[in-house]
Amino acid sequence: MYRLMQPSDWAEVLALWQAQRGDTEEFVRGAVERFAGVQNVYVAEENDHIEAVALAVPVTLQGRPGSYLFGLCGQGSLLLAGLVDTLCAQQKLRGAGFVVAVPASPEQSTLLQDKGFQKAFALRCLPREVERNLWSQAEFDSVTAKKLCELRERFWPDTVMLTPEKMAVVLGDLYSRGATIVSSEQGYGIYFRKEDTLYFVELMAEDDRSAEKLMEAAREKEVIVEKAVITVGAAQNLFLGEGTRQDYGMIRFEGEPFDVSESYMRLMLENG
């Protein structure tokens, strides 16, 4: 039986999620209660036990309402496929024109493709040497969740958008894992430092030079850094022609299909 989660299901949902995904109780609670909302959590019940779970997080893309399928886990591909069908059908009834997802594994990608999802939101990954430049100035960790939503809207409006409240959960998770946000009037970047390398998981700027200045400012802050690995949207206007293309997300249209060839999706709490 497929249904919405009830408060009494919490212990079973937590145990299933942790067994399948290995996240902390704090992370799971944040995902269920604050990122999706309990009213958007779907479960598959069999013989009085919760066997699968999936979250439907409200999002928008190009001004259209939709949902982000998150946290899909459970036993049995048929059960999971049925849960995906149920979630998508219910979201369509609620007015969603599409459902997006970030597959957690090749098997999940295949399952979603079988359910009508298609690949979208490809990324480009590129290494860059970072020059020393004492004159490159920027601010650090001054961007709020609300501001991050506004910056995404400004620099790449064709982005799968979360509300500021949902983005606050994502930002909290990023900070807990050691992320730093560098920003200026011309752009911003979110990065992790590992040894002598900066890994930018999101970088948006007016042009290549503005992006380079952000990286240079980050290098001055982190001192021993010499290079960066940047991940941007495949269609993003930075360092065009550079980098290796990577698959990332998927989309299923619940209404009239629309063009998502230049659309961007990233930082969807999927690395918890």
Protein language model features and the residues they cover:
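Active-site rim helix/loop that mediates acceptor-substrate recognition in acyltransferases
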Residues: 10, 15-61, 155-180
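Conserved GNAT acetyl-CoA-binding A-motif
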Residues: 90-104, 223-233
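Conserved acetyl-CoA-binding loop-helix of GNAT-fold acetyltransferases
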Residues: 74-91, 101, 114, 208-220
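C-terminal functional modules
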Residues: 233, 237, 241-272
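A short, well-structured alpha-helix characteristic of acyl/acetyltransferase catalytic modules
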Residues: 7-19, 141-155, 261-263
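Conserved beta-strand in the GNAT
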Residues: 43, 48-58, 66-73, 183-199
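Amide-forming acyltransferase catalytic core, primarily the GNAT-like/NAT-type
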Residues: 45, 114-199
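Conserved catalytic-core motifs of GNAT/GCN5-like acyltransferases
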Residues: 102, 118-133, 245-257
